[in-house]
Amino acid sequence: MMISDLPEDMVEEILSRVSIISLGALRWNDLSKARVICKAEARQQFAGFMIKGSKVCSMRFDLHGIQNNNVEVVEPSIKQIAKFNHVEISQVFHCDGLLLMMSKEVSNTRLVVWNPYLGKIWSIQHRSAYHSENRYTLGYDNNRKPQNLEVAYHSIKGITYLFNGGEKIGEGPTGCLLCFDFTRERFGPSLPLPFHVAHLYTEQLAVLLHNWGAFAMEIWVTTNIEPNAVLMEQLLKNYLLYTSDFIGSFFIDQEKKHAVIFDSSLSCGSVACIIGETGNLRTVDLGVAAVPYRQLPVCSYAPSLEQINQGQELPLIGLTQIFMEQHKYWVSTFLDNLITKYG
C-alpha cells in the first residue's frame, strides 16, 4: 500500500509527527499543495504573526477552553522573532506558508519574504522606490511561481483578491471582489458581495459585516470560490456588546461558530474579541498601542515547504489608488520587475 492510498486525515496525522528534515525531499502537491497541514491541531488553536511595536511577533491562541457557559481561554502566546530585531516592520502578509513583510524605514523601505517553517529569508530588490502607503501581497501563476501584487489584501489558493467598494467612496455598488490572475497578469470579472468588509481565513474567504446602526455583526463564509464565481452562507450573527473604532483581521472556528476579531480601539487599545452566537465570550488585551484608523497587522499561518529561487525575476503589477475631487478615485497600473535574493 502506498501512502497516497491512505485517508487524507491519516496522512496529515503522519506528516504532523515527522520532522521537516525528513520531509524536505518530498512534495505533496496533489494532497496538500506542498503545505504541511495538521487539521486536528488547527481546530484547537490559531497560529499566526502580528506586528507589535514595529517588530514581527509570533502569536498562538488556544481555542480548546472556550465554552459558552464556562468561559476559559488560555492567554495568547506572543513572542518577538529575534532574527528581525534590527528591522522595523509595517506590514505582514501570508500566502501558502510564505510571509511577505515590508520594512518601516522611509528612506530604505524593503520587502522581505520569509518561510518560518524552513527558516529561509529572501530579500526583494525593487528597481524603483517603494511608497509607504502601498500594500503588497503574494500569489502564484499556473506554474506555482511566486508573484507580487501591490494594494491587494487577501490570497486564497495562490490567487489574490482585493475588495472594491464602488466608483465613489460610500456610494455605488455595495461592494465586490476583484480576482487578479498572476498567469495572465490581469483582473478577472467582479464578484458581487453583500457586504463592505472582507478578510481571509485559510482555504475559505470569510466576509464580515459590521452594521453600526444595529450594533450587529455577521460573518459569512464561502462554500465555493473561483476566479469567476463565489457562493456564501452565513456562519453567525452577533449583537455587539461593545463599540469599536476600527475592526481589523479576524479568524473563525466554523465547528463551534466562534470568531476572534482583532480590534484597535483608542479607548481599549488593541484587543482580541472572542464572540459566538450567544454574545461576547471574552476580550483579551494584546498589549499593543492602538493607532487611529489603522488595522492591527495580524495574519494567520500554516507551515509550508514553498521556496523562491535565488535571482528569480518577479513581475510587479503596481496599483496606485489616486483620490480626486468629489471623492472619485481611479486606479493606475504599472509593470516592473523584482529580483529575489537569498539572505
UniProtKB/Swiss-Prot annotation:
Protein name per the record: Probable F-box protein At1g67455
Short name of any one Pfam family annotated for the protein: FBA_1
InterPro entries per record: F-box-assoc_dom_typ1, F-box-like_dom_sf
Organism encoding this protein: Arabidopsis thaliana
Domain F-box: 1-46
Superkingdom of the source species: Eukaryota
Classification of source organism: Eukaryota, Viridiplantae, Streptophyta, Embryophyta, Tracheophyta
